[in-house]
Regions:
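An anion-engaging/catalytic patch
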Residues: 1-118
Length: 118
């Protein structure tokens, strides 16, 4: 795992199969200490779900479209909750990865991480 500095913040990233994954957790720390809630709130947004679904459609032949439709229909509702792990486990997503442990957190493909940061 490597680090880069952006606006004075250390952001972890790593490469796998020539794909760059950037820590959403570290990006979120720049905005708020409650990183988990920030990421989950971002995932609740309908536009985020639409973007993630399109990204997975382009790059993931094993994406579970049926579960994606369930999330898309619920996105934006006050009762809708979604964690990165829930997204990955139910849709077979490859754009977001969750890691546990010392160097853990939520990582996303650079395309998705840049969307999160914007």
């Amino acid at each position: 795992m490597e680090q880069l500095e952006v606006l004075g913040a250390e952001i972890a990233y790593y490469r796998t199969s020539e794909k760059d994954y950037i820590s959403l957790t570290d990006i979120a720390k720049y905005k708020d200490k409650r990183t988990e809630q920030l990421i989950q709130n971002w995932l609740r947004n309908r536009m985020t779900i639409e973007y993630l679904g399109l990204w997975e459609k382009l790059y993931n032949s094993n994406f579970n479209y049926l579960e994606f439709e369930v999330f898309r229909n619920k996105a934006g509702l006050n009762s809708f909750l979604l964690s990165p792990t829930g997204w990955v486990n139910k849709t077979n997503a490859i754009g977001i990865i969750t890691k546990r442990g010392r160097y853990g957190g939520t990582f996303a493909h650079k395309d998705i991480a840049f969307e999160f940061a914007s």
